[in-house]
Amino acid sequence: MKTLVSLIRSENFEQEVIAEKRPVLVLCMPRDEEFPKQVEVIEVIARKYSTELKVGLLQEDFIEAFKKNYSVVGTPTFLILVEGKERGRMLGLADQEMLTDLISHV
Protein backbone atom coordinates (compact mmCIF):
# COMPACT_ATOMS: atom_id res chain seq x y z
CA MET A 1 0.00 0.00 0.00
CA LYS A 2 1.28 3.45 -0.93
CA THR A 3 1.99 5.72 2.01
CA LEU A 4 0.22 9.05 2.37
CA VAL A 5 2.85 10.28 4.83
CA SER A 6 5.39 12.70 3.32
CA LEU A 7 9.05 12.57 4.27
CA ILE A 8 10.02 16.11 5.26
CA ARG A 9 13.65 17.15 4.74
CA SER A 10 15.42 20.50 4.88
CA GLU A 11 15.41 20.56 1.06
CA ASN A 12 11.63 20.14 0.71
CA PHE A 13 10.37 21.85 3.89
CA GLU A 14 9.29 24.96 1.98
CA GLN A 15 7.28 22.94 -0.54
CA GLU A 16 5.90 20.29 1.84
CA VAL A 17 5.00 22.54 4.78
CA ILE A 18 5.20 26.30 4.13
CA ALA A 19 3.55 26.27 0.67
CA GLU A 20 0.97 23.61 1.59
CA LYS A 21 -2.58 25.02 1.74
CA ARG A 22 -3.85 22.32 4.11
CA PRO A 23 -2.72 22.06 7.74
CA VAL A 24 0.28 19.73 8.13
CA LEU A 25 0.61 17.27 11.01
CA VAL A 26 4.33 16.72 11.59
CA LEU A 27 5.82 13.91 13.67
CA CYS A 28 9.14 14.88 15.26
CA MET A 29 10.59 11.66 16.64
CA PRO A 30 13.85 9.70 16.63
CA ARG A 31 13.89 6.19 15.19
CA ASP A 32 13.55 4.35 18.51
CA GLU A 33 11.57 1.26 19.59
CA GLU A 34 8.29 3.26 19.70
CA PHE A 35 8.79 4.70 16.21
CA PRO A 36 7.05 1.93 14.19
CA LYS A 37 3.91 2.18 16.34
CA GLN A 38 3.72 5.95 15.94
CA VAL A 39 4.20 5.65 12.17
CA GLU A 40 1.24 3.22 12.06
CA VAL A 41 -0.89 5.78 13.91
CA ILE A 42 0.00 8.66 11.58
CA GLU A 43 -0.62 6.41 8.54
CA VAL A 44 -4.18 5.85 9.79
CA ILE A 45 -4.61 9.59 10.37
CA ALA A 46 -3.21 10.34 6.89
CA ARG A 47 -5.80 8.03 5.30
CA LYS A 48 -8.65 9.31 7.45
CA TYR A 49 -7.95 13.00 6.76
CA SER A 50 -6.36 12.73 3.29
CA THR A 51 -8.36 15.60 1.79
CA GLU A 52 -8.16 18.09 4.65
CA LEU A 53 -4.77 17.39 6.25
CA LYS A 54 -1.26 16.55 5.11
CA VAL A 55 0.81 14.28 7.35
CA GLY A 56 4.58 14.44 7.42
CA LEU A 57 7.44 12.65 9.10
CA LEU A 58 10.77 14.38 9.62
CA GLN A 59 13.82 12.82 8.01
CA GLU A 60 16.18 11.84 10.80
CA ASP A 61 18.95 14.29 9.87
CA PHE A 62 16.45 17.19 9.86
CA ILE A 63 15.07 16.58 13.38
CA GLU A 64 17.60 18.71 15.29
CA ALA A 65 17.20 21.77 13.05
CA PHE A 66 13.40 21.43 13.20
CA LYS A 67 13.49 21.11 17.00
CA LYS A 68 15.50 24.33 17.22
CA ASN A 69 13.23 26.26 14.83
CA TYR A 70 10.02 25.17 16.58
CA SER A 71 11.30 25.04 20.18
CA VAL A 72 10.69 21.31 20.51
CA VAL A 73 12.22 20.08 23.77
CA GLY A 74 11.00 16.50 23.92
CA THR A 75 10.01 13.73 21.57
CA PRO A 76 7.84 12.45 20.21
CA THR A 77 6.19 15.76 19.45
CA PHE A 78 3.29 16.17 17.05
CA LEU A 79 2.85 19.66 15.60
CA ILE A 80 0.12 21.01 13.39
CA LEU A 81 1.48 23.72 11.11
CA VAL A 82 -0.48 26.03 8.84
CA GLU A 83 1.74 27.79 6.30
CA GLY A 84 4.66 27.01 8.63
CA LYS A 85 3.04 28.53 11.73
CA GLU A 86 2.24 26.35 14.71
CA ARG A 87 -1.48 25.83 15.36
CA GLY A 88 -1.31 22.83 17.67
CA ARG A 89 1.17 20.68 19.60
CA MET A 90 1.18 17.47 21.56
CA LEU A 91 4.14 15.95 23.39
CA GLY A 92 4.33 12.22 24.03
CA LEU A 93 3.23 8.95 22.47
CA ALA A 94 -0.15 9.23 20.77
CA ASP A 95 -2.94 7.01 19.60
CA GLN A 96 -5.46 7.73 16.86
CA GLU A 97 -8.00 9.21 19.28
CA MET A 98 -5.48 11.65 20.77
CA LEU A 99 -4.39 12.89 17.35
CA THR A 100 -7.99 13.19 16.18
CA ASP A 101 -8.64 15.39 19.21
CA LEU A 102 -5.57 17.54 18.42
CA ILE A 103 -6.68 17.92 14.79
CA SER A 104 -10.22 18.87 15.79
CA HIS A 105 -8.93 21.97 17.59
CA VAL A 106 -7.32 23.45 14.48
Please tell me what each predicted stretch does:
Residues 22, 70-82, 97:
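Structural micro-motif
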Residues 33, 37, 62, 97:
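Short alpha-helical
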Residues 6-9, 28-30, 43-65:
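Thiol-based oxidoreductase modules, predominantly thioredoxin-like and allied folds used
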Residues 79-106:
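Non-catalytic, surface beta->alpha helical segment in thiol-disulfide oxidoreductase systems
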